[in-house]
A protein has these predicted regions:
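Extended repeat-based scaffolds of very large eukaryotic assembly and lipid-transport proteins
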Residues: 22-98, 102, 106-148
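Register position in tetratricopeptide repeats
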Residues: 94, 125-129, 147, 181, ...
Length: 253
C-alpha cells in the first residue's frame, strides 16, 4: 500500500496542474490569420526571450497575433532550430487554435525537454480556448472554485457548462478532476472517458483515468491508462518507472 500511495502522489500533480496550468489562457482568436512578415522566426525568438523574463506581459501575445498565424507557428515548431521551436511552442500556447493540437502533441516528443515542457503548457492553454469566450470565462471560474476547494459549487457550475457546451472537452475534464477530489471515482472515470472521446490527445484525462482506477484497486485498467498517457506525453517525470512498478504489482499480487 505504501508503494501504491507514492505512485498516486507522483501523478496527482499532473491532473491537479490542469487548474491554472501555465499562463492565463489567451482569449479565443476571432480574426483571420495575418500573413507573416518574419518567415525565419527571428522576431519570434526575441519575443520568446522577453516572455521568459516577463511571462505575464500582455503585449507579447499582441505581438504574436500581429505578426504570426497559428499555421506559421506550427511550421516553425516542426522544423525550426532549438530556440525557435521553444519560441513557437510558447506562441501556440498564446494564440494557437483547435488545428494546432496535432502539432503541439507532436512537440511533446521533441528531443529537447524544454520544447516538451513548453508544448505541455501550450496544450492546456489551447484546450481551454476550444470553447467560446463565454465558455472559457465560465470554465476559469470553475477552476478557481476547484482551487479553493469549493467542490460542490464547482460541480454545479461545470455541469451547467457541459449542458450548454457538451463538446467542450476541457469542461468534462475539469468535472472529472472535481469528482476525483470528492472521491467520486466512478463519476470521474466516466468524465475522463468522455474527455478522451472528444479529445484523444488529452494526456491529463488519461493520467486522471489511471489515478481513478488506482484508487479503486483496478490495476490492469490503471496500467492501460498510464500506457496511453506515456504514448501521449512520454516525458512526464517518472512515468516509465512507475509503469514498471505497476506491471510488477500486477504480476505479484
Amino acid at each position: 500500500m505504501r508503494q501504491r500511495a507514492g505512485f498516486l502522489c507522483l501523478f496527482a500533480g499532473l491532473w491537479v496542474g490542469s487548474v491554472g496550468a501555465g499562463e492565463q489562457p489567451a482569449p479565443l482568436l476571432e480574426r483571420s490569420p495575418q500573413p507573416t512578415s518574419d518567415p525565419l522566426g527571428l522576431r519570434l525568438v526575441r519575443l520568446y526571450r522577453e516572455h521568459v523574463l516577463r511571462p505575464m506581459a500582455q503585449h507579447i501575445r499582441q505581438e504574436m497575433e500581429r505578426h504570426y498565424s497559428p499555421r506559421h507557428l506550427e511550421r516553425l515548431l516542426a522544423v525550426g532550430d532549438l530556440e525557435t521551436r521553444r519560441a513557437a511552442a510558447v506562441g501556440i500556447g498564446l494564440i494557437g487554435d483547435a488545428d494546432s493540437q496535432v502539432s503541439v502533441a507532436s512537440a511533446l516528443h521533441d528531443p529537447d525537454l524544454e520544447v516538451c515542457r513548453r508544448a505541455e503548457t501550450a496544450s492546456w492553454q489551447v484546450w481551454i480556448r476550444l470553447g467560446s469566450l463565454e465558455q472559457q470565462t465560465r470554465l476559469v471560474r470553475v477552476q478557481e472554485l476547484i482551487r479553493v476547494q469549493e467542490l460542490h459549487a464547482a460541480v454545479a457550475q461545470v455541469s451547467l457548462l457541459i449542458q450548454t457546451a457538451p463538446e467542450y472537452a476541457e469542461a468534462w475534464n475539469q468535472r472529472a478532476l472535481t469528482y476525483y477530489q470528492m472521491q467520486r471515482y466512478r463519476d470521474a472515470i466516466s468524465d475522463c472517458q468522455r474527455t478522451l472521446e472528444l479529445n484523444p490527445l488529452h494526456f491529463g484525462a488519461a493520467s486522471g483515468l489511471a489515478q481513478c482506477h488506482m484508487r479503486l484497486n483496478e490495476l490492469p485498467q490503471a496500467l492501460n491508462a498510464f500506457q496511453l498517457t506515456v504514448q501521449l506525453n512520454p516525458n512526464l517525470p517518472g512515468l516509465q518507472e512507475q509503469i514498471a512498478v505497476l506491471t510488477s504489482m500486477i504480476k505479484t499480487p
